[in-house]
Amino acid sequence: MKTPHGRAGINSVFGVPGPEGSTWYKQNITTVKLPFPIVYENDDETLDEVTRCRFHVKVAPNLIAALNAIWYHARVEVKKEVGYDKTTEEYDTLTYKWLKDKGLLNYGGTFNYRKIRGSENLSLHSYGIAIDMAPGLN
């Protein structure tokens, strides 16, 4: 898929979004099983583990590929730090901890039909093509 440019390009590729329950939503938004759990911080600062999210069907595979690349990079860094003599289970635990310690498991959301704050334009979250990862770091 060629990367769209501008709102017209985005609408052309992903359609004009609608709220949850709309025909557009039913045809374009899918629930994605994440390759590893991430953490959503609620407004009251409690944390919820997230294992699935809603994303546009056209780019859901790209989301999984990006998250797998993050996991793979973290795994390589962990192996550099602790060596190459651990079990897969031990590496999984250490990789998750490595990501958590760096704030890279924190998640702010995906599909959310809403306008950009201070604007009349819809957020890219309305299309299901945006994810907020490590929102406290950016």
Each PLM stretch: what is its role?
Residues 29, 105, 109-114:
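Aromatic-residue hotspot detector
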Residues 1, 45, 104-109:
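Auxiliary tRNA-acceptor-end handling modules of aminoacyl-tRNA synthetases
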Residues 98-103, 126, 135-137:
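Flexible, surface-exposed loop/gating regions in the mature catalytic domains
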Residues 4, 24, 101, 121-123:
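Homeobox/homeodomain signature
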Residues 14-103:
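Active-site acidic/histidine clusters and adjacent loop/turn architecture
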Residues 110-135:
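Short, surface-exposed glycine/acidic/tryptophan-bearing loops
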Residues 1-17:
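N-terminal low-complexity, Pro/Thr/Ser-rich intrinsically disordered segments
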